[in-house]
């Protein structure tokens, strides 16, 4: 079972399109949020995010998870 907190973190990143901005919004550190997302991806066995220099983009699996988690 996926923790609700992890889904909230994921949705914030999807909304902000930035791990840094999502971390600020969620009042957690950027490294903590990044690690949580890597753990979520590992648990699901799917890449959810494409991490660019300026922007985070959802993969197809990430977009699917977003649609189900909202």
List the predicted regions and their residue ranges.
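Short, basic/aromatic recognition patches that contact phosphate-bearing ligands
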Residues: 5, 10
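Short helix-boundary/capping micro-motifs
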Residues: 11-27, 53
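Residues in the recognition helix of alpha-helical DNA-binding motifs
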Residues: 36
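Alpha-helical residues within the helix-turn-helix
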Residues: 24-25, 42, 63
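Coiled-coil helix of the DHp
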Residues: 62, 66-70
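A short LG(V/I)-centered, amphipathic sequence patch enriched
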Residues: 41-58
């Amino acid at each position: 079972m996926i923790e609700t907190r992890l889904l909230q973190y994921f949705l914030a990143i999807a909304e902000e399109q930035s791990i840094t901005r999502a971390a600020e919004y969620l009042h957690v550190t950027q490294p903590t949020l990044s690690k949580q997302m890597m753990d979520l991806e590992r648990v699901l066995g799917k890449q959810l995010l494409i991490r660019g220099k300026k922007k985070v983009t959802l993969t197809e699996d990430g977009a699917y998870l977003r649609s189900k988690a909202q």
